[in-house]
Amino acid sequence: SDAVADGDHAISGVVDS
């Protein structure tokens, strides 16, 4: 959900798939 690029990670409020 709404993944935001953070270096080489994907940060999201809720991790879904």
From Swiss-Prot:
Q: Which UniProt keywords apply?
A: Secreted
Report, as the record phrases it, the tissue specificity of this protein.
Answer: Expressed in skin glands.
Provide GO CC annotations from the record.
extracellular region
Would I find NADP among this entry's keywords?
Answer: no
Q: What is its main location?
A: secreted
Q: Where located?
A: Secreted
Record carries keyword Ribosomal protein:
no
The family note in this entry says:
Belongs to the Frog skin active peptide (FSAP) family. Septenin subfamily.
- Annotated function: May act as an antimicrobial peptide.
Entry protein name: Septenin 1a
Lineage of the native species?
Eukaryota, Metazoa, Chordata, Craniata, Vertebrata
